[in-house]
Amino acid sequence: MTFEEFAATRMPAVLKFAAVLAGDRVIAEDLAQEVLVRAYSRWDKIGCLDRPEFYVRKMILNEFLSWRRRSVRQVLPGGAAGEPASTAPDHAHVYGERQALLAELGKLPRRQRAVLVLRYYEDRGDAEIAELLGCTPGTVRGYASRGLAALRVEMDPRPRARA
């Protein structure tokens, strides 16, 4: 597969993955552009792989995680996760809940967020996530557990008692 074929057929899926990770379409486009420039320069090796998209997604994941090392920790803005506009009407309540979830997901540490996106959006197993992140499946489960616990606390509709 040539780079041009890859970009034409797989770019929307790769961009959507980046958008879910970043929580913002503009940031996702920057992520994807950075990665695709590097992928293009190495396409003679990447294009020969059985699953070049898997490799490019791993590059996007690594680029997303490396932002933390480059700058001070920041909360990524919540967004529509790069999803195309639906032709069906979106109910305000469902939209509000989705926006709230994306906002809370954006507050998680990057590795917890990455694990949750890979597990629930990409539907990947712990072993595959561990391979992508360069850690053990137990560490992946720990990140997922802590991330889900944080989301449960923040998304709980019951009012919290004030201390």
Which ranges hold each PLM region?
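A short, charge-rich alpha-helical start-of-domain segment used by transcription regulators
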Residues: 1-16, 26-29, 40
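Short helix-coil-helix linker/hinge
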Residues: 95, 105-113
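Internal acidic/polar
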Residues: 66, 74-98, 103, 125
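Short amphipathic alpha-helical boundary/capping segments
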Residues: 5, 100-108
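Arg/Lys-rich amphipathic alpha helix in sigma70-family domain 2
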Residues: 47, 58-79, 94, 157
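A short pre-motif secondary-structure segment
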Residues: 115-119
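DNA-recognition helix of helix-turn-helix
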Residues: 133-157, 163
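Σ70-family region 2.3-2.4 aromatic/basic alpha-helix that recognizes the −10 promoter
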Residues: 36-40, 50-70, 144, 148
